[in-house]
């Protein structure tokens, strides 16, 4: 198994595009920077994809975004499954909603055409299958038609089927009352000096700035060796020994072994899952998201460059002094 040397990314997403010219044309991709990627697909900057380069389909709009992937590899797995729900091994054969009725020249099943209904149903199904059901994902809708298709599908799901877990985040942002250049790029109205606040993909945080205070707290605790006793098992924690995670809440300096946090979060879990989602901090009694804790932990262990940039630290550089002989 390959060794991971990078922290959990600030943002990595799987997106769904729809042509504003031909609404029956869709494209699924993944990116850490949705605004830049949309510009590439629309030919505004270099890049994009062959399938979105046809001028008679541009401009494209990002109608749905799934964020929260812990790595590019994780996002690519989800992207492939969403693009190929008729083939994906993540979906049990008996639960497939999309079935191919034709084959390509190489004999492989041909990818069925997409529609809003098929995209919404496949997305809902993937969020429920065991492979992805406990991932810390958030689904964002930037288009009313797409959200209506999602709600219609959710309303039709039978009670006997696996539903989405309660902690799933589903967000809508339709940019009411603004003039958009596509999926949230806001233009100033005539006679106005400043444009309204951005919405949609242009309002997404692309860096670690939202967790700056949390990261700073963790740095201070471990730099000054203030970790103390584990908030779960009460054992004294030694600096530099083991993996220690910090409570996400402001004002709480609760620290614990990662294994203890995990065991505490899973103690009331009756599904046999091994991946925690949420739990209560024993010190402050507030709800803590496992994904946020792991993002800070990986930044602390594997993201010194990112931490220095976030906290505006000057990195120490080794300098070589020439010796005069």
Swiss-Prot record:
<keyword id="KW-0234">DNA repair</keyword>
<dbReference type="GO" id="GO:0008821">
    <property type="term" value="F:crossover junction DNA endonuclease activity"/>
</dbReference>
<keyword id="KW-0255">Endonuclease</keyword>
<dbReference type="GO" id="GO:0017108">
    <property type="term" value="F:5'-flap endonuclease activity"/>
</dbReference>
<feature type="domain" description="GIY-YIG">
    <location>
        <begin position="10"/>
        <end position="92"/>
    </location>
</feature>
<comment type="subunit">
    <text>Forms a heterodimer with SLX4.</text>
</comment>
<keyword id="KW-0862">Zinc</keyword>
<dbReference type="InterPro" id="IPR050381">
    <property type="entry name" value="SLX1_endonuclease"/>
</dbReference>
<protein>
    <recommendedName>
        <fullName>Structure-specific endonuclease subunit SLX1</fullName>
        <ecNumber>3.1.-.-</ecNumber>
    </recommendedName>
</protein>
<keyword id="KW-0539">Nucleus</keyword>
<keyword id="KW-0540">Nuclease</keyword>
<keyword id="KW-0863">Zinc-finger</keyword>
<feature type="zinc finger region" description="SLX1-type">
    <location>
        <begin position="230"/>
        <end position="284"/>
    </location>
</feature>
<dbReference type="InterPro" id="IPR035901">
    <property type="entry name" value="GIY-YIG_endonuc_sf"/>
</dbReference>
<keyword id="KW-0479">Metal-binding</keyword>
<keyword id="KW-0227">DNA damage</keyword>
<dbReference type="GO" id="GO:0033557">
    <property type="term" value="C:Slx1-Slx4 complex"/>
</dbReference>
<comment type="function">
    <text>Catalytic subunit of the SLX1-SLX4 structure-specific endonuclease that resolves DNA secondary structures generated during DNA repair and recombination. Has endonuclease activity towards branched DNA substrates, introducing single-strand cuts in duplex DNA close to junctions with ss-DNA.</text>
</comment>
<keyword id="KW-0233">DNA recombination</keyword>
<dbReference type="InterPro" id="IPR048749">
    <property type="entry name" value="SLX1_C"/>
</dbReference>
<dbReference type="GO" id="GO:0000724">
    <property type="term" value="P:double-strand break repair via homologous recombination"/>
</dbReference>
<dbReference type="InterPro" id="IPR000305">
    <property type="entry name" value="GIY-YIG_endonuc"/>
</dbReference>
<dbReference type="GO" id="GO:0008270">
    <property type="term" value="F:zinc ion binding"/>
</dbReference>
<dbReference type="InterPro" id="IPR013083">
    <property type="entry name" value="Znf_RING/FYVE/PHD"/>
</dbReference>
<comment type="similarity">
    <text>Belongs to the SLX1 family.</text>
</comment>
<keyword id="KW-0378">Hydrolase</keyword>
<dbReference type="Pfam" id="PF01541">
    <property type="entry name" value="GIY-YIG"/>
</dbReference>
<dbReference type="InterPro" id="IPR027520">
    <property type="entry name" value="Slx1"/>
</dbReference>
<dbReference type="Pfam" id="PF21202">
    <property type="entry name" value="SLX1_C"/>
</dbReference>
């Amino acid at each position: 198994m390959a060794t991971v040397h990078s922290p959990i990314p600030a943002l990595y997403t799987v997106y769904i595009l729809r042509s504003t010219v031909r609404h029956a044309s869709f494209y699924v991709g993944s990116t850490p920077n949705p605004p830049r990627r949309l510009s590439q697909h629309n030919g505004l900057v270099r890049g994009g994809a062959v399938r979105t380069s046809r001028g008679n389909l541009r401009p494209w709009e990002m109608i749905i975004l799934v964020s929260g992937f812990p790595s590019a590899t994780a996002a690519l797995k989800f992207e492939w499954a969403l693009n190929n729900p008729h083939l994906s091994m993540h979906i049990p054969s008996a639960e497939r909603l999309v079935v191919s009725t034709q084959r390509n020249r190489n004999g492989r099943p041909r990818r069925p055409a997409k529609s809003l209904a098929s995209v919404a149903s496949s997305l809902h199904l993937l969020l429920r299958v065991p492979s992805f059901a406990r991932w810390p994902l958030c689904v964002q809708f930037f288009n009313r038609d797409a959200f209506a298709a999602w709600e219609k599908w959710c309303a039709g799901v039978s009670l006997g089927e696996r539903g989405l877990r309660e902690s799933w985040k589903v967000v809508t942002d339709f940019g009411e009352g603004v003039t958009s250049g596509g999926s949230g790029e806001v233009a100033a109205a005539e006679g106005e000096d400043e444009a309204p606040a951005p919405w949609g993909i242009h309002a997404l945080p692309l860096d670690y700035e939202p967790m700056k205070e949390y990261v700073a707290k963790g740095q201070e605790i471990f730099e000054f060796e203030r970790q103390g006793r584990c908030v779960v098992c009460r054992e004294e924690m030694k600096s530099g020994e083991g993996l220690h995670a910090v409570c996400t809440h402001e004002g709480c300096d609760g620290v614990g072994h990662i294994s203890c946090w995990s065991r505490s979060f899973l103690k009331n879990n009756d599904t046999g899952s091994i991946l925690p989602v949420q739990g209560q901090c024993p010190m402050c009694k507030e709800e803590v998201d496992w994904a946020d804790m792991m993002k800070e932990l990986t930044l602390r262990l594997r993201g010194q460059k990112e931490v220095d940039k976030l906290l505006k630290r000057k990195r120490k550089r080794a300098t070589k002094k020439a010796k005069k002989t």
